[in-house]
Every structure is written in C-alpha cells, then in structure tokens.
Amino acid sequence: MIMTDFIDSPYVRDMAQTTENLYRHGWDERNGGNVSLRLTKEEVEAYAGTDKVLRQIPIKFDASELAGKYYLVTGTGRYFKNMVEFPERDMGLIRISEVGNSVDLMWGFNDGGEPTSEFPSHLMSHIARLKQDPDQRVIMHCHPTNLVAMTFTIPLSSKRFSRTLWKMHPESIVVFPEGVGVIPYMCPGTNEIGEKTAAKMADYRVVVWPHHGVFAAGDSLDETYGLVETVEKSALIYTTIREQGGEVLQSLTDKDFRDLIKRFDLKANEDFLTPDAVGATVD
C-alpha cells in the first residue's frame, strides 16, 4: 500500500490554513505569532516521511514530562502569510526526546529552521492543559488588535477583563465561561513568561499578555481559532463603544449571565459572576 506523504495530511493543511487566517485577520503581522498542535503516534505513523529523525534540536526547557509526544509547530522567524506555499519550510513535526531538553525533527524545517522561540512556553502550557483535559491539543499565540488595546485602558485583572468581555455579547460567556486569565507584562520569549502563562492555563483557556497578545488552548485548530475570534469580537465591540463616546445606556446584566448559564448548562467562573465593591483589587 502506498502511504500518503505527511505534507498532504489534514494536519499540515489545517495548520497552513489556520495560520493564513490569523495573518489575514491582522493578528500575526510579519513573523509574529506561533501555533503548536499535538499529534498521536498513530496519526503520525499513518503518513510517509515521518519515520526517521532528521536532526536533533536543543530546547531551553525540560520537557521530559512530554517525552515521546509529537507536535506540529510553526518555525521561529517565519511569516504566517507564507505557510500555505511553503509548509515544509515554515513548520516542522517534532518529537520530544526522552531526556526532555531536545526534540527530534521528523519532518519539515527543510532549510535548517527550528521551532518558534516561544516553544518552551507552548510546552509548559500543553503540560498545564493536559492535566485539566487530556483532549487538549492546541496552543495558539497571536496578537488580536482590540484585545491588546484593552490592556492599555482596563486594569490588568482577570475578573475585570472577563466581566467586560462577557458583557459585550451573549456568546462570550457561552464560549469562555471560565473567563480569561491576565498576567502582568513580561518580556516575551523567556521561560519566566511561559511559567506564568502555564500557571494561568490551569484555570483558563485564554491568557492575556498585556500590550502583546494572547495564548489560547483548545481541542482542535478550529476550536482554538474560534475561541480567539470570540474574545476578539467582544474586544472589538468594547472598542467601538469607546469610539462612540463610551456612554453605555444598557448592557448584559448579572441576571442575563445566570440565564445563559442555565440555558446552556455552563460551568461558569462563580468568582466572576458578581462585580467587585468599589475600590476592590482582584487578580
């Protein structure tokens, strides 16, 4: 039986299409943004060209907890607008080594490339999310314009951000009933920001990086993309309200939240369902 080449797999196709959509939205300019997708051994071995280690690539993180797991990941310095045309150059299929401080390249990065510089942060978040849900496969980092803008105008509080976004549209609490996590501004590309993000990923599928972007998690590329889309739509509505003068005459209420929770049988974040007292500070 002739096996299909990995480049023609739905995983490569979907990754290329998703990253192009992120670029078209304006959320991943230049080489901004990165995505990783966990694949099973069976999914990988069903395709030709994935059975030999092409080279080993060191990583600055002990990922031994994920030893043997496969990830399709975008490359460092690569432009998402080029992924559809050059998938074998701009993404790679890697396997975490047993010792955890390197990865085996099984496919891709055919010009000598390496995984995104944020890959340690991805792996930390994959570890955190797998502990919450074994079906979680995707970590996505991008720069949604309106959500980033909100980090300049709203206190950097998970509760304040979540309630503000929930109030913008009824789909918000339905799609991210746990809310969104917010961390302080930190230098990107470091293990420190990865650790802080992973800690929030224990409770949230979306973590806001102030003045920068988001990390989001999901079961599939489509689901994770849709999660970011929904968060950004709420942020766009918030931005549009401010452009119209900022006066809000009516909006979704806490009772409306409760009605949505009941209607869609949601496990919402109870801590975020009531506003704080004036002057209160929360994470």
Curated annotation (Swiss-Prot):
Binding site for Zn(2+): 141, 143, 212
Pfam families the record matches: Aldolase_II
Keywords: Cytoplasm, Lyase, Metal-binding, Rhamnose metabolism, Zinc
Catalytic site positions: 118
Reactions that this protein is recorded to catalyse: L-rhamnulose 1-phosphate = (S)-lactaldehyde + dihydroxyacetone phosphate
Record family assignment: Belongs to the aldolase class II family. RhaD subfamily.
Name assigned to this protein: Rhamnulose-1-phosphate aldolase
Taxonomic source organism: Lactiplantibacillus plantarum (strain ATCC BAA-793 / NCIMB 8826 / WCFS1)
